[in-house]
Amino acid sequence: MSGRLYVVATPIGNLEDITYRAVRILKEVDWIACEDTRTTRRLLDHYGISRPTLSYHEHNETGRAAELIARIQQGETGALVSDAGTPLLSDPGYRLVHAAAEAGVRVEALPGPSALLAALVVSGLPTDRFLFAGFLPAKQGQRRNVLESVAEEAATLVFYEAPHRITETLEDITATLGQRPVVVGRELTKLHEETLRGTADEIRKSLITRDAIRGEFVVMIGKAEASEGGSDVPIETMIETLIGAGIERMDAIKTVARERGLSKREVYKLISGPRGPKQSR
């Protein structure tokens, strides 16, 4: 093989989920760049692959990318893998592939496992258009800002989340996006694989009853529907439902305003006006 870079997808859980081609290429390349050499070595040993590994992660990728491109230009062939799944999707690799493209190095993808796609295709949510935004920020304020920024997208929203933040994130989804359909995938392709469906609040209540929350999560949220100016559910009821789910009153008003295509002031007037027939829009 002439010098080139292969971007190779590896299993996200079940070790049978790898292609024949991926195994063959990993046996033939001069080196394999990976996030954690120990994790990748266990994977390689399982398939009888003995090629040398090089660490490539977020803390060294800028300098390492230049080094690896230079080696490829000298005729070596390398492979890029992540700890699990497809590289570059919320994993290191962008700088290396970008540098390769800039240098005129040939880059080939070996497609395979991806938690994003595995979760999406079993979700039951629309897949004709989706927006993947990786991991949400760890801080609540920043997390809610991201959710609000994509609230009007007419696409299924997809995020990754860690087990220690999943219930907080579901609470933020309720506060910012309301009662949209939500699907959560956990431990995909592994022994305890699970798909949870409902509203964000329903799934959160299910999770908090467990002794422990483990595994990596993929969170998918139904797309924003075009406002038709009408609803069978009164605005007051929508707000009461959100408050009952633990959402602050002003956050509930903000969420309902977005869903109904109204300003926060208009919603506030509707629920603060003189008592009488309930108004809805």
What are the language-model segments listed below?
Residues P92-Y94, R249:
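Glycine-centered tight-turn and secondary-structure capping sites
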Residues I25-I32, G104-E108, T156-L157:
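Short active-site oxyanion
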Residues C34, V107-G112, F159, V184:
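General beta-strand structural signal in soluble alpha/beta enzymes
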Residues S55-T62, L136-K139:
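Conserved helicase motor
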Residues R4-V8, Q74-S82, F130, A155-F159, ...:
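Generic beta-sheet signal
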Residues M1-E58:
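Glycine-rich, flexible N-terminal cofactor/catalytic loop recognition
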Residues S2, T77, T156, P163-R281:
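A contiguous loop/helix-start segment that scaffolds small-molecule binding in enzyme catalytic cores
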Residues R95-E153:
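Class I SAM-dependent methyltransferase SAM-binding "motif I" and its flanking Rossmann-like core
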